[in-house]
Amino acid sequence: MNWMEFISSIVKSIIWPVAIIILVFKLKQPVSNLISTLAKIKYKDWEFEFTIDQKLDKISFQLNKENQYGTDDQNLKDSLNLESNSEITEETHSHYNEKTSIKGDNDLLLKMEMIRLYGAVKNLYEKVSEKDDAADKSQGIGMLYMVDYLKRHKILNDSFAESLLDIMNIVHDLEKSHISQSYIMNKFFWNVDKSVKRLMEITSNYVAENTAGETSN
């Protein structure tokens, strides 16, 4: 082997390790940036889900107290100040697993639940505003207007009215993002169901009271 062949063999033996080192060095910064970006995205997803979870727990707690204290705002506020949201656990919502276990379109499920909630609010609103000529009687009346109207007429207490609007806002958040944790959706369905049942109860009581009043007159 002459000296040219010797040098050539050395070059061939080191060229691939050198190439790999150069490639790693060149890619080091972009890869680290990519990892950092992915970590930030994952953290934001986790932070978003945690925030939604906390909001749903607050609504669940308020709805539980609503069922205990009804439309008595002061008793409800005192109770909310004395107790913690921590009593709301995953077990509270566990029986709603069937809805989220369906491998279907989450957006469709959300829309169906909101139609239920909107319908319950509108039914109550129509009963209360039936003889009020100043009330909005249009078909596409907004949730915010109806809830505010019912609150002003002392049909809904402040806490329950706030919970209804919070649920509406959470729906918009859920529609924009993919929630990976099914228990969060379980809580959402639980809150909607509790709200609908409470609205139906309030409607029934309102109709009964007014029917009794008209009969006595």
UniProtKB/Swiss-Prot annotation:
Location within or outside the cell: Membrane
A Gene Ontology term for the protein's cellular component: membrane
Predominant location category: membrane
Key words, A-Z: Membrane, Transmembrane, Transmembrane helix
Chain ranges passing through the membrane: 5-25
UniProt membrane topology term: Single-pass membrane protein
Name of this chain's protein: Uncharacterized protein YqbC
Organism: Bacillus subtilis (strain 168)
Gene designation: yqbC
